[in-house]
């Protein structure tokens, strides 16, 4: 991740100051880039992605079903699947089997990282290596899950957080700037250190036992202009024209 970060910084720095505008997905990213490249914040347009989650998909989960955690991500090392797996393994060791399940959107065959994850934690009964999900299946799992876990170390915008938040259910998120901004306005959220599995494990145990008192609402921070919530507004800023219609950013 460190080498990738250095390469990314070098790539971005080439001709970056020659642009009239730069488009970013999040306000925290505007702050970082402005500081990193010594550019005015007014050169950055914040254009947050919009969710297309279907409100017609409802949960068919029975009341006495096992408590379900869900983590949706691609099998990349910065997604930090190992932290979620470690926490789940420790929780199963403490509570026993059939007390909860953690569903992952990888099956352990996608790449070397996924293979390593399955080798390390494929034997843990409470961890379900489901594999890739199409859009419909993903949204169905959002509806079925009791709680979203999102431990990713690096994101510009955590889209699964946006999508899951529409269900107004608990979320356990990495204590990082992207997660705070993406979850803004959500009412049942707790943040954990993305390097401490035992902290996540304790939160998972607490929520399984029906205690959500440690969770709270994430405050909404006003995003300064220039900011675009749809394509038309974005194009209007870029061309110095007035918006004429709405078109969601995806």
Language-model segments: residues:
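Membrane-proximal helix-turn-helix segments that form the acceptor-binding/catalytic region
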Residues: 2-22
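Conserved donor-binding/catalytic core segment of Leloir-type glycosyltransferases
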Residues: 62-79, 85-88, 103
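Aromatic "clamp/platform" in nucleotide-sugar-dependent glycosyltransferases that forms part
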Residues: 153
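A short, active-site helix/loop in glycosyltransferases that binds the activated sugar's phosphate group
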Residues: 16-42
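Conserved acidic donor-binding segment of nucleotide-sugar-dependent glycosyltransferases
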Residues: 189-198, 206-210
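Glycosyltransferase donor-sugar binding loop
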Residues: 100-115, 131-132
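Nucleotide-activated donor-binding/catalytic signature segment of Leloir-type glycosyltransferases, i.e.
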Residues: 114-136
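Short alpha-helical donor nucleotide-sugar binding micro-motif in glycosyltransferases
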Residues: 140-145
